[in-house]
Amino acid sequence: MRVAVSGAAGRMGRLVVKNAVAEGLKVVQAFDINEVGKDAGELAGVGKIGVPIEDDISKLDADVLIDFTTAEAAMKNAEVAAEKGVRVVMGTTGFTDEDRKRLAELAEKVPMIVSPNFSLGVNIFWKIVEYAAKMLYEWDAEIVELHHRHKRDSPSGTALKLAEIIRKVKEEKGIEADLKTCREGISPRESEIGVFGIRGGDVVGEHTVFFFGSGERIELTHRAMSRECFAIGAVRAAKWIAKVDKPGFYTMDDFLE
């Protein structure tokens, strides 16, 4: 199985290269606008693999592309991959609704798995939160997420998915709940789901969902201790999508099932 990695010089990209090599996959291309010409394996700490970093995605030639870049770059990369018939594992976040619509259109050409978080723990966490939301749909729900100071998007894609899970459950129970990403001044709490992002230091990622009842509350938390969990999940998703013949917009639920 031939794998290309876009964003290969970044924090996540290096870990993807490292774990792809560890899983016995053949990394054949590595794309980034930084560290051009350097060996992707050396950057990943696994020694030379004979794959230099290049910055021209139009040269893409692989079975699967694993993307951890920026939303803008990822959209271009997905366009090229779809045109060339290359399957896509998309770990980039920060997409607009229009971007997601376009990704779904591109997925009509090639199998594509898109997730704001490839960690197995987070995907189980989503299921736990959904179960709790069904039991506690009348309770107030708030989400707080913490990430390192360099994270580009806020709230995180993982937090937004948590909010969407809770919103859908409430909607099924006849409760309208809007997403609230900031509050200012003093006002009564309306039917809403608050999502708040904190940025600082080198926090890999932490998400806490609060359910507030009368005289009690439940807190559910997932903490990523290392980015390794995201890379491992993405590489395993790549091995899965490589065996999928039917084009489509797949999620981690499809992979886990």
From Swiss-Prot:
Record has Cytoplasm as a keyword: yes
UniProt keyword list: Amino-acid biosynthesis, Cytoplasm, Diaminopimelate biosynthesis, Lysine biosynthesis, NAD, NADP, Oxidoreductase
EC number(s) from the headed UniProt entry: 1.17.1.8
Pathway(s) of this molecule: Amino-acid biosynthesis; L-lysine biosynthesis via DAP pathway; (S)-tetrahydrodipicolinate from L-aspartate: step 4/4
Superkingdom field: Archaea
Annotated Gene3D superfamilies: Dihydrodipicolinate Reductase, domain 2, NAD(P)-binding Rossmann-like Domain
Protein's name in the database: 4-hydroxy-tetrahydrodipicolinate reductase
This protein's encoding gene: dapB
